[in-house]
Amino acid sequence: MIRYTQMFGKEWKHDHKNFAERKVNMDRNAPIGVFDSGIGGLTVAREIMRQMPQERIVYFGDTARVPYGSKSQETVLRYSRQIIRFLKTQGVKAIVIACNTASACALETVKQELDIPIIGVIYAGARTAAEATHNGKIGVIGTEA
C-alpha cells in the first residue's frame, strides 16, 4: 500500500521547496485533482480519501484514450497537459498523476510548467516496494512509452 500522506509531505516538500516563494494563493478548501489513463487511479483517489478524509477529490479517468502505454511520449505529454488544464479549471490545489505511464513521460515536464504542486506515483510505489522486499530484489514491469 502506498502511503500518500508520506508522499504528499516528503515529496512535495522536496519538489516544491520554493513553492511558498512563488506566492501562489492556494485555497485550502480546493480539491485535489487525480488523473489516470483509465479507472485504475480510482484506487489512488480512494487511498487519498481514506488517509485525508477532509480533502475533496476531482478524478479524471481518460477512458476515451486508454491505454497510454502504446502511445508515444509526446502523445502522453500532450494528453497530460490537456487533462491538467481541465483540472485547473476545476480549481484544484494540487494534482496527482495516478498513471505510471503519464508519471514517467510527463511529470518532470509539467512540474516546470505549473504553479501548483504535482506528484506522480512511481516514486512512492518504488519506495514501498523497496521497503517490502525481503531479498533486495524487485521486479519492474512497464509499458512501451
Explain the meaning of each model-derived region.
Residues 4, 15-18, 25:
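Intrinsic-disorder-associated, low-complexity terminal segments enriched in Asp/Asn/His/Tyr and depleted
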